[in-house]
Amino acid sequence: MAGHPRRSGVPPVNEIRPAADGKAVSGMGSERAWCVLAPNPSPMTLDGTNTWVIAEPGASSVLVVDPGPDDEEHLRRVVDVASAGDRRVTQIVLTHGHLDHSAGAARFAELTGAPVGALDPAFRLGNEGFAAGAVLDAGGCELRVVATPGHTADSLSLLLAADGALLTGDTVLGRGTTVIASDGSLGDYLRTLDELRSLADEAGLRVLLPGHGPLLSDPAGVLDYYIAHRKERLDQVRAALAAGARTPAEVVEIVYADVDRSLWPAAEQSVRAQLDYLAPGS
């Protein structure tokens, strides 16, 4: 965000914001959060995975969110940013287990000696378990774990109340909307969006720090859009079914006709989630 001074000891980086072409860049997301953009751009990961380095000004402890892909150069860049000013990484947190967020976690733990925490025990290293509502502390910088299932069953967000910021992983993206994965649930996702919309008011959120894409400076407006978009898509799916579509692929051809065909497989996954949600008795 504009206007935040750079702290001493931190390598110079640009602010994370939409570039001229609407893409994210590495740098400061809020006073206590920096992004290191991973070199894994794709239609699904947008500009790449945002690895977040969280630290209280002047503190010696750092928390890192989503080390990202198992890319040695990227992981060492994160180490450089995190260890500036004689700081050390004391915790690693995964917003969910997808490989673009978690594949580098084991190697990053080797480089830093820090444990890896996640809601799903399968992704933990060093027995770092926690539940929704837990408060994580890194040198006085507190983040509250918010369970945000939907994109995946194990998705979480992190409330950085001191900055009015929410780290959203893939629950809310910096550009476009997210896909409901095979282990996710649209019903859970809709409830999550409603809960985050309430949190935006209750916590006075000023910025969303996503797992992909640039930061979002209007949390309430973004969440209102996400909720409206999901409801509109459900209405479109209902209309496609009424018009005779019977399979997810047929629904995609109607509902996502304006979407690049390279994204249709992902759209088909979302349609499956929508059909499950609309099924009688669901």
Please describe what each predicted stretch is:
Residues 1-16, 21-25:
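Actinobacteria-biased recognition of intrinsically disordered, low-complexity terminal regions
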Residues 113-120, 167-169, 261-263:
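Short hydrophobic/aromatic-enriched beta-strand-loop microsegments
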Residues 59-64, 69-71, 142-239:
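Metallo-beta-lactamase
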Residues 95-101, 151, 212, 274:
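Histidine-centered divalent metal-coordination motifs
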Residues 22-82, 142, 157-169, 174:
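Conserved beta-strand hairpin/beta-sheet module of binuclear metal-dependent hydrolase folds
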Residues 7, 239-282:
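C-terminal regulatory/interaction regions
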Residues 42-48, 67-144:
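Active-site HxH/HxHxD metal-binding segment of metal-dependent hydrolases
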